[in-house]
Curated annotation (Swiss-Prot):
F-type ATPases have 2 components, CF(1) - the catalytic core - and CF(0) - the membrane proton channel. CF(1) has five subunits: alpha(3), beta(3), gamma(1), delta(1), epsilon(1). CF(0) has three main subunits: a, b and c. Interacts with TMEM70 and TMEM242. PROSITE patterns: ATPASE_C (PS00605). The gene is ATP5MC3. This is ATP synthase F(0) complex subunit C3, mitochondrial. It holds the Pfam family ATP-synt_C. Residues 1-66 form a transit peptide. Belongs to the ATPase C chain family.
Length: 141
């Protein structure tokens, strides 16, 4: 219905409805008595019909939708950057375990160190992946 209303709209109707588009939707609807015509379209004081009300509603809700989308981007990016802190905790755990393992069995120094480097690389990769997702949410969407 909305697509049909956008196609049936004339430029004169848009100009007539643009004066009211600056008012909040509640003030525009409540301040005019509504009457029904025979064709089923709504007329407000003989100058506006349902099509101009749809145009007005679209004009006023796009700013709200844009603000909601921006807030959702920031919330998602903030949640994704929590993974970077998890990466730091993982690196600390890996090297803490390396020190404990070396204290228990010093003869396994080379094998423990290679496992620690592998754990460091995996933990750092996950942190960088979380940071990349945060930047993608902010700048690519």
């Amino acid at each position: 219905m909305f697509a049909c209303a956008k196609l049936a709209c004339t430029p004169a109707l848009i100009r007539a409805g643009s004066r009211v588009a600056y008012r909040p939707i509640s003030a525009s609807v409540l301040s005019r008595p509504e009457t029904r015509t025979g064709e089923g379209c709504t007329v407000f004081n003989g100058t506006q019909n349902g099509v101009s009300q749809l145009i007005q509603r679209e004009f006023q809700t796009t700013a709200v939708n844009r603000d909601i989308d921006t807030a959702a981007k920031f919330i998602g990016a903030g949640a994704a950057t929590v993974g970077v802190a998890g990466s730091g905790a993982g690196i600390g755990t890996v090297f803490g375990s390396l020190i404990i393992g070396y204290a228990r069995n010093p003869s396994l120094k080379q094998q423990l160190f290679s496992y620690a480097i592998l754990g460091f690389a995996l933990s750092e990769a996950m942190g960088l992946f979380c940071l990349m997702v945060a930047f993608l949410i902010l700048f690519a969407m």
